[in-house]
């Protein structure tokens, strides 16, 4: 496992077209879960890792809420994510996972098969004001910009996570234990901006999901995140 002792996070969740989301996960043997109105759930999460077992780095995850193909999705997928990890069928398929160090990139790709690449990532969280940027590694221009001030919110827990990924032709299910309080907020002025000229695959996927100039449904933020990324288990 990889241990993360002292970290910050800004996570924004968006309701996106379910057919467009399904097109991005079908080849991995996964199916999207639908929320109210038949929409799929996509997340953009910016992380600032200040103390981990593999060093200091920043990371951004773009992911879609899914279950393995053929699995009956819960009627209320968001509520189901409050279950214990062993009983939670709903997880996230990571589409892109840029990081700022080669060590973090190698670990994620070699152990879990995560779609990591190395590029600069800016992270600034001051109160409820956030500014985060992923740089296009090819053009060195902004690929993704998430910024704004979160709206009214309440204290709450950070959710434990289930992650699905393909590794060595198998489907891995990985549990992520989290600890530390967060603020769960309305989106306020938070917006995602995607480069309309970048040809990088991450930019193409973000645009395909309709996340250019998108407003999240809600956001989580915290300066007290701790987590444990466990070894993945191959599903039968």
What are these regions (language model features)?
Residues 23-24, 63-65, 92-94, 184, ...:
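Hydrophobic transmembrane signal anchors and adjacent membrane-proximal interface regions, especially
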Residues 36-39, 67-72, 87-92, 120-121, ...:
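Glycine-rich loops and low-complexity Gly/Arg-rich segments
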Residues 43-98:
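Hydrophobic/aromatic-rich structural module bridging two neighboring secondary-structure elements via a short loop
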Residues 5-6, 77, 115, 165:
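Compositionally biased, intrinsically disordered low-complexity regions enriched in proline and serine
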Residues 40, 58-60, 126-128:
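A generic structural signal for short beta-strands and their flanking turns/coil linkers
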Residues 1-57, 69, 78, 199-202, ...:
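N-terminal domain-onset segments
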Residues 40-42, 85, 107, 157:
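Short linear sequence motifs
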Residues 95-236:
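Interaction-surface and assembly-scaffold signal
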């Amino acid at each position: 496992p990889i241990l993360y002792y002292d970290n910050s996070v800004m996570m924004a969740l968006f309701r996106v077209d379910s057919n467009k989301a399904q097109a991005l996960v079908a080849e991995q043997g996964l199916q999207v879960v639908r929320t109210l109105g038949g929409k799929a759930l996509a997340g953009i999460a910016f992380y600032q890792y200040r103390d981990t077992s593999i060093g200091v780095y920043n990371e951004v995850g773009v992911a879609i809420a899914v279950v393995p193909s053929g699995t009956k999705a819960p009627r209320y997928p968001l509520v189901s994510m409050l279950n214990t990890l062993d009983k939670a069928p709903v997880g996230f398929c990571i589409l892109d996972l840029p990081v700022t160090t080669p060590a973090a990139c190698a670990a994620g790709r070699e152990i879990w098969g995560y779609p990591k690449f190395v590029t600069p990532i800016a992270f600034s969280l001051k109160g409820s004001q956030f500014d985060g940027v992923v740089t296009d590694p090819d053009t060195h221009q902004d690929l993704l910009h998430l910024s704004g001030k979160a709206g009214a919110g309440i204290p709450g827990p950070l959710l434990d996570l289930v992650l699905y990924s393909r590794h060595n032709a198998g489907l891995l299910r990985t549990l992520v234990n989290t600890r530390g309080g967060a603020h769960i907020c309305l989106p306020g002025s938070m917006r995602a901006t995607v480069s309309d000229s970048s040809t990088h695959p991450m930019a193409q996927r973000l645009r395909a999901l309709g996340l250019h100039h998108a407003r999240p449904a809600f956001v989580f933020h915290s300066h007290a995140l701790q987590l444990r990324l466990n070894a993945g288990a191959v599903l039968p």
